[in-house]
């Protein structure tokens, strides 16, 4: 770290120096100490806020500078981190382990309930996906061409999803909190700016919950065809561990959704079967959501975006109700993003690299892919998307 880094203000906007805030080596929102703790009435119970933090607290109802990193209903607590437009842009994902902001504020849910009940719902769009399908790239492209605040995989969605599944909580209480969390996430920096929430793939069940809550919510579901999804799951050890974990999360839920009494039980290394079950489960979730007959719910094969990136990104912006930025060379921005895919400034990945990786994986793991095709056809039956998913964006 150079001398400039040592003395510069932290990009989170906390008012502290970078090396004393988000620049502390090894610090994340998970392991950072709580800087400010509020009482149930909103008064400061612990810590001394900087003027910048006090302003963020005072404007929390309208300004997203304090972002809900985690909401723990069982503990009656919520934790927020100080953010800024730059820090949102640099945060590949917004879960506590990877979000850039590490200045932590803690409150009770009693206080949050009062605050959220005063926050108006502002139209917000969602991107759901299967994983390995360019959803992060789409969020970046929307930010480059439109007035857009992309929220990439906020854990708060998973927190409310888990809460909704709690049978001990009354439905009306769960729905009230669902609305509060959605309104909290819908805050933006200026009225023209549209919020686009790119959900974690865990959160695909929320598609139906959202449509019940507000049938007009715009949604895009991104996916890759099964063979490419399987190739993405098996091409490296970290990916194989990933699909094992994902399979374990849905294996108890998938039979009812897929109407399969006898669900295949993959062996420990049957990654193709695990991928087929997880992919089929998510495709079935989309098809269930399509039953709401919302014109605002569309699907997109990642390959179509790679073939026609500018047209697809513009069509997505229109679907999601975003306003184009003025004075932007859209083609140049798209060429920059798609010429070298970059999740952030430390990650570079070209389309040629992706194509070679997929081609190699399709060849090397043909047995996994062939088995996956058999399993997915069994699980989805006539609903297997031979010609792509319904409601295509283009």
Go through the PLM ranges and name each one.
Residues 1-43:
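Acidic/negatively charged segments and metal-coordination signatures
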Residues 11, 125-132, 196-200, 272-276, ...:
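Short, charged/polar micro-motifs that form catalytic or ligand-binding hotspots
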Residues 14, 135, 342-345:
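Short linear Ser/Thr-Pro motifs
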Residues 25, 29, 146-149, 320-324:
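A generic secondary-structure signal for well-formed alpha-helical elements
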Residues 32-292, 296, 303-326:
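PAPS-dependent sulfotransferase catalytic domain
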Residues 33-116, 258-275, 283, 287-293, ...:
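PAPS-dependent sulfotransferases, especially Golgi type II membrane carbohydrate sulfotransferases
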Residues 169-180, 239-254, 346-356:
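A polyampholytic, Gly/Pro-enriched intrinsically disordered region
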């Amino acid at each position: 770290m150079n001398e400039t880094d040592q003395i510069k203000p932290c990009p989170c906007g906390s008012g502290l120096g970078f090396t004393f805030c988000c620049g502390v080596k090894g610090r994340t929102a998970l392991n950072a100490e709580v800087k400010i703790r509020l009482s149930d009435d909103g008064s400061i119970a612990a810590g001394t806020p900087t003027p910048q933090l006090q302003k963020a607290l005072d404007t929390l109802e309208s300004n997203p500078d304090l972002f809900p990193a985690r909401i723990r209903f069982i503990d009656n607590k919520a934790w927020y981190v100080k953010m800024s437009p730059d820090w949102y842009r640099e945060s590949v994902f917004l879960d506590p382990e990877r979000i850039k902001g590490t200045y932590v504020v803690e409150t009770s849910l009693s206080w949050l309930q009062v605050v959220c009940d005063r926050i108006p719902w502002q139209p917000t769009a969602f991107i759901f996906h299967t994983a390995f399908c360019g959803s992060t790239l789409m969020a970046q492209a929307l930010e480059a061409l439109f007035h857009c605040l992309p929220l990439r995989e906020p854990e708060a969605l998973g927190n409310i999803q888990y809460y909704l599944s709690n049978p001990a909580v009354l439905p009306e209480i769960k729905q009230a909190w669902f609305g509060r969390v959605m309104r909290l996430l819908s805050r933006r920096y200026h009225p023209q700016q549209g919020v686009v929430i790119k959900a974690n793939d865990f959160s695909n069940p929320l598609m139906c919950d959202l449509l019940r809550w507000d049938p007009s919510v715009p949604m895009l579901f991104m996916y890759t065809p099964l063979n490419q999804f399987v190739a993405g799951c098996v091409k490296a050890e970290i990916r194989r561990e990933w699909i094992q974990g994902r399979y374990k999360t849905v294996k108890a839920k998938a039979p009812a959704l897929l109407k399969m009494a006898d669900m295949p039980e993959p062996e420990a290394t049957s990654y193709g079967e695990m991928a087929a079950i997880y992919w089929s489960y998510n495709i079935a979730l989309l098809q269930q959501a399509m039953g709401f007959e919302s014109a605002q719910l569309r699907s997109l094969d990642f390959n179509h975006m790679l073939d026609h990136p500018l047209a697809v990104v513009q069509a997505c912006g229109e679907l999601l109700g975003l306003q184009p930025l003025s004075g932007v060379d859209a083609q140049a921005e798209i060429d920059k993003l798609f010429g070298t895919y970059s999740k952030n400034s430390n990650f570079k990945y070209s389309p040629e690299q992706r194509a070679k990786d997929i081609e190699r994986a399709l060849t090397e793991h043909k047995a996994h892919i062939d088995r996956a095709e058999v399993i997915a056809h069994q699980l989805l039956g006539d609903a297997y998307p031979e010609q792509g998913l319904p409601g295509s964006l283009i």
